[in-house]
From Swiss-Prot:
Highest taxon of the lineage: Eukaryota
Annotated GO biological process: mitochondrial electron transport, ubiquinol to cytochrome c
Binding-site list for heme b b566: 97, 196
Protein's recorded name: Cytochrome b
Function: Component of the ubiquinol-cytochrome c reductase complex (complex III or cytochrome b-c1 complex) that is part of the mitochondrial respiratory chain. The b-c1 complex mediates electron transfer from ubiquinol to cytochrome c. Contributes to the generation of a proton gradient across the mitochondrial membrane that is then used for ATP synthesis.
Record membrane topology: Multi-pass membrane protein
Length: 381
């Protein structure tokens, strides 16, 4: 009798993707984040769907509707806390996933990598428009500051900003369209995830050594399904701990006040996962320059495959590149800290130095380290 799992048109796709998929035998826990991101996406879509059933995207009632969800809807407080902290978990997994890709040279699968960068940008856009929806002080002023950056574009900037706003400032029209974007984007992300996996399964997974693993493959199920299940339990443990014990730990107290266009908060700052980019934006005293640096800080990921100079794929056996990678990690943590600080000395100069170092590491130092390591492997003396 033929196995339905291997013959049915739909089951066959699932089988080739999650069950009989040949996977390298040595992939570490750093390869768990892909599945965790998929789970985060499902959690966000489900909690978001239930929130959307009770939310109203009107400037007069948006803030009250969120309070109503937390007070009057059955387990509304839990759904809201899971959704808000789920976003933080999503970005934590995203950053670790991208970091893994850089460390182990996964970016050499160019199609998979490029779709991944597009996914990162789409998730960032989704999180930004989502943060505006509760219509608190930081929601309103965050939206005002970030959308205002469009006006830095020469000639068309102001028109573009007003087009996004649907008026002359962030108002009812802006909130309504941001809700529409926030609802549709996760489904676009889901479609992109399918394409991301499609390209990944064309080549198969990379592995920590960076060496072709074809000589030693094992089936995805049961080995990596059980490993992913462990990752899932740890993810849920952290998410539930956050949502149940300290749901407002990563939020901003200003967002407990309804949006007031006449009262600017003392320190306007985005959620923690955007602070590194915000610090780079603020470190340049010119508006257009700051916007370009902000874009470059993310889009630089697209050119990483072309900056790979080493003869080895992974950093596993490249100590100089490893050192630079961990300096880059520390630098990003520094930028995140600076992004949350007021614009005054010494934070300004620290932010500027960290921003310069960020681009220097990726564009100059890491490619040079790769070339030097090649030389050390085959010295000419």
């Amino acid at each position: 009798m033929t196995n339905l799992r291997k013959t049915h048109p739909l089951m066959k796709i699932i089988n080739h993707s999650f069950i009989d998929l040949p996977a390298p035998s040595n992939i570490s826990a750093w390869w768990n984040f892909g599945s965790l991101l998929g789970i985060c996406l499902v959690i966000q879509i489900l909690t978001g769907l239930f929130l959307a059933m009770h939310y109203t995207s009107d400037t007069l009632t948006a803030f009250s509707s969120v309070a109503h969800i937390c007070r009057d809807v059955n387990y509304g407080w839990l759904i809201r806390n899971l959704h808000a902290n789920g976003a933080s978990m999503f970005f934590m997994c995203l950053f670790l996933h991208v970091g893994r890709g850089i460390y182990y040279g996964s970016y050499l699968y160019k199609e998979t990598w490029n779709i991944g960068v597009i996914l990162l940008l789409t998730v960032m856009a989704t999180a930004f428009v989502g943060y505006v929806l509760p219509w608190g002080q930081m929601s309103f002023w965050g939206a005002t500051v970030i959308t205002n950056l469009l006006s830095a574009i020469p000639y068309i900037g102001t028109t573009l900003a007003e087009w996004i706003w649907g008026g002359f400032a962030v108002d009812k029209a802006t909130l309504t369209r941001f809700f529409a974007f926030h609802f549709i984007l996760p489904f676009i992300i889901t479609a992109l995830v399918v394409v991301h996996l499609l390209f990944l399964h064309e080549t198969g997974s990379n592995n920590p050594s960076g060496i072709n693993p074809d000589s030693d493959k094992i089936p995805f199920h049961p080995y990596y399904t059980i490993k992913d299940a462990l990752g899932l339990m740890l993810l849920l443990l952290v998410l539930l701990s956050l949502a149940l014990f300290s749901p407002d730990l990563l939020g901003d107290p200003d967002n407990f006040s309804p949006a007031n266009p006449l009262n600017t908060p003392p320190h306007i700052k985005p959620e923690w996962y955007f602070l590194f980019a915000y610090a780079i934006l603020r470190s340049i005293p010119n508006k257009l320059g700051g916007v370009l640096a902000l874009l470059a800080s993310i889009l630089i990921l697209l050119i990483i495959p072309f900056l790979h100079t080493a003869n080895q794929r992974s950093m596993m056996f490249r100590p100089i590149s490893q050192t630079l990678f961990w300096i880059l990690t520390a630098n990003l943590i520094t930028l995140t800290w600076i992004g949350g600080q007021p614009v005054e000395q010494p934070f300004i100069i620290i932010g500027q130095l960290a921003s310069i170092l960020y681009f220097m590491l990726i564009l100059v130092l890491m490619p040079l380290a790769g070339m030097f390591e090649n030389y050390m492997l085959e010295p000419k003396w």
